[in-house]
Design a protein with these regions (language model features):
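Sequence/structural signature of beta-propeller domains
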Residues: 23-722
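Gram-negative bacterial Sec-dependent N-terminal signal peptides
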Residues: 1-22
Length: 722
């Protein structure tokens, strides 16, 4: 099954592909891991998070909520390229939102003992002393808190959230939510004069149980409120009474992936999907934008702009999600709500009304020119950390900051992060590879092996691994463009159907227009270690299984690269198998004509404590074989991501079962500096390396199909290879 695509040009694709006059763009300039904010002597292995984020009036300090630790965290961004930890302040509960109010910080804190007996407080912290100076009882569980632009009051969305384990999470579930309005004087709340605003009886869905979710205030002092599970929006006037309210409505979606089946298939339809908005931001005194995340029965994979009278001005209808697909960030494992657009932000940068839309599951931020609210223009998509929850714009400093909530260190993965972006003249650094511009939408991800066209410089092919087990695919890449372009996708087939039980980790040319593919086996999932010969259409023409000698000693970590030298296929085995000495892995040789096997041993670097070392690619160019050797560590724990070379003359395989010769290796390049070039954290899986016909080296990382990953794919050339 083969898909050939004619390249077209979209506004976003044109802006990133062709040389244009320099314009103002956002690029990431710093990353701050939340464990850095823990004090000396604290258990830094504890779960930490960065959820909702805001900035001081001068834009020099960020505050974020960290609910697992029950604190708010502070970050000094006086130098935005070098954020500094300012520590945390305990809240005596679960902080939900924090805002600066002059030299104070006001924080919504959830203190509920149960869903049926919710409670919470509005806490005020004096920044000079870092002490709590006031607390207001809110009478329920707070979610979002907003501060009026003039600093005169705050409004709190008291959600009194539902218990999802009761009646399958259906509402109504008492008690009902409401809104609290509290005046501020010198940053201190006037608790005695707080106003409780009833929003029952408004929604069509469970009107007796409003579930306020997100709240924002415009320059006129009007409050806009999303009630997510109720699929309703409420506008409260400056006098504290309901001025208007309306259903958030529904969206029809076409060309979406509707099944979680290990394949990217954008041909489905979803009709009448409730928006169920989460985040909301006023654009001006008449319009606001919403992110239609969904939480109960909806989630329309879109964002919208409404007038405050309920008139729909703009509906994205999945356009941002399609752009996310082109970037390789579509989270196939979360299909119901797709990319799950969570929150929004708005600010005016140098006279340009600019909207930001955050995708929680795709871990990206869409940047829009909202000069005409009826016709937003997508300008960029920025990479963020894993599961961005909150975002704050600082237009006076040309900065943007995101709070990324998921901490995966318990699984050996990345911590939660705050990321800082700067708006400056230049070109977008990300994406580095995209399928934008094709006639039909090409979804992709988990690029795990790379090979160059033997004749055309800059032309490459890559394979996807078992994340997309139902549609293993070979991608054609044009790396002469910037960003590199995926121009075609060929599904690997067996007997006319997408081949099953493959985990493609290596690809090499067969010299006849087809490819040899290396599949990493996993016996506990019935996936065999094997080699596959496919033609240009992706049809499997031959399969080579492991011989008994190797099957007897195989383990999970198998083939991670393949290269062809004459009639011999060479494969890198990622980690030691049962018969390998510690620190030695096999480079396996298979003679295609003689149908015989042999091997040599490759010496691995010594891993740090708690880490393992392995190979993740093998390619041949000139008189050398090149491998990627890496540890399995990520972020600040990553220590080894390197390219080594072995002289082909030394690749003299011995028979299996005999003592294997040990080859000598030479370091070619340390990839760690390349992996932080975009000012993010170091990803663990550097998986593909190829040298093109002009001798240029290309590297690609595996984004794990955006599963427990930010989805970032780094693709770059470091120039001529020695």
């Amino acid at each position: 099954m083969i898909l050939r695509h004619v390249c077209l040009t979209s506004a976003l694709a044109l802006g990133t592909a062709l040389p244009v006059q320099a314009e103002m763009v956002f690029n990431r300039i710093a990353t701050f891991a939340t464990p850095q904010n823990m004090a000396e002597g604290e258990d830094t292995a504890r779960e930490s998070s960065a959820e909702i984020i805001s900035a001081s009036d001068d834009g020099m300090t960020l505050v974020y909520t960290d609910s697992p630790l029950g604190v708010v965290g502070l970050v000094d961004i006086t130098d935005p390229r070098a954020p500094k930890a300012l520590g945390t302040i305990a809240m005596g509960g679960e902080p939900t939102t924090a805002h600066f109010a002059g030299d104070k910080i006001v924080v919504g804190v959830n203190t509920s003992e149960s869903y049926t007996n919710p409670s919470g407080k509005l806490v005020t912290v004096d920044m000079a002393t870092r002490s709590v100076v006031a607390e207001c009882d809110l009478g329920g569980q707070p979610d979002s808190v907003a501060k009026a632009p003039d600093g005169s009051f705050v409004a709190v969305a008291v959600e009194n959230e539902r218990d999802e384990d009761v009646n399958d999470g259906a509402i109504p579930q008492a008690p009902a939510g409401f809104v609290v309005k509290v005046a501020l004087k010198d940053g201190l709340p006037d608790c005695a004069a707080k106003q409780v605003i009833d929003v029952t009886g408004l929604a069509d869905i469970a009107p007796e149980d409003p579930e306020p979710e997100f709240i924002d205030i415009n320059a006129a002092g009007e409050i806009a409120l999303t009630m997510q599970e109720n699929n309703h929006i409420v506008v409260i006037g400056a006098d504290g009474t309901v001025a208007s309210h309306f259903s958030a409505g529904a969206v029809d979606l076409d060309g979406v992936d509707t099944k979680r089946d290990g394949a990217l298939n954008f041909t489905g339809k979803m009709e009448g999907v409730l928006r169920e908005p989460d985040g909301l931001r006023w654009i001006d005194n008449d319009h606001f934008m919403i992110a239609n995340e969904g939480d109960w029965n909806g989630g329309s994979r879109s964002w919208s702009i409404f007038r405050k009278d309920g008139t729909l001005v703009y509906e994205d209808a999945g356009a941002l999600e399609r752009a996310i697909v082109e970037m390789g960030h579509y989270p196939e494992h979360r299909n119901k709500k797709g990319a799950e657009l969570e929150s929004v932000e708005f600010a005016v940068f140098d006279g340009v009304p600019t909207g930001f839309v955050v995708s929680e599951r795709a871990s990206v931020i869409g940047v829009y020119d909202l000069t005409d609210p009826a016709n937003p223009v997508l300008k960029q998509i920025l990479p963020s950390g894993i599961s961005p929850e909150g975002i704050v714009a600082l237009p006076a400093r040309n900065l943007l900051a995101s709070a990324n909530e998921v901490d995966l260190r318990e699984d050996g993965l990345a911590p939660a992060h705050v990321m800082v972006f700067e708006r400056a003249e230049g070109t977008p650094a990300y994406p580095m590879i995209t399928s934008a511009g094709t006639e039909a939408l090409i979804g992709w991800g988990a690029l795990s092996g790379l090979v160059a066209d033997p004749e055309a410089p800059g032309m490459l092919h890559a394979v996807s691994d078992s994340v997309y087990r139902s549609a293993p695919t070979i991608f054609a890449i044009d790396a002469t463009q910037k960003p590199a372009r995926i121009t075609g996708a060929t599904v690997v087939t067996r007997d006319g159907a997408p081949a099953q039980l493959l985990d493609l980790e290596g690809i090499t040319n067969d010299g006849e227009g087809g490819f040899w593919l290396a599949s990493e086996g996993r016996s506990d999932r019935l996936v065999p270690h094997a080699l596959y010969h496919v033609n240009a259409k992706g049809e499997i023409k031959a399969q080579v299984a492991l011989p008994p000698e190797l099957l007897a000693v195989e383990q999970r970590f198998g083939f991670e690269g393949i290269a062809k030298v004459g009639d011999v296929l060479w494969m890198a085995v990622q980690r030691e198998w049962k018969d390998d000495p510690k620190g030695m892995v096999k480079l396996l040789a298979y003679d295609i004509k003689e149908k015989t096997w042999g091997a040599v041993h490759y010496p691995l670097d010594t891993p740090a404590e708690g880490a393992w070392m392995g190979l993740s690619e093998l390619t041949v160019h000139g008189d050398w074989a090149y491998v990627i050797e890496r540890d399995n560590q990520i972020a600040d724990k990553a220590a080894v991501k390197k390219i080594y070379r072995i002289a082909l003359a030394d690749l003299k395989p011995a028979a299996l079962g005999t003592e294997l010769p040990v080859v000598a290796k030479q370091e070619v390049r340390d990839l760690l500096p390349d992996l932080v070039a975009l000012n993010g954290y170091v990803v663990d899986k550097v998986e593909g390396f190829a040298i093109d016909a002009a001798g240029q080296g290309f590297v690609v990382t595996d984004n794990d199909g955006v599963d427990d990953s930010s989805g970032e794919t780094l693709f770059w050339s470091f120039g001529p290879v020695q």
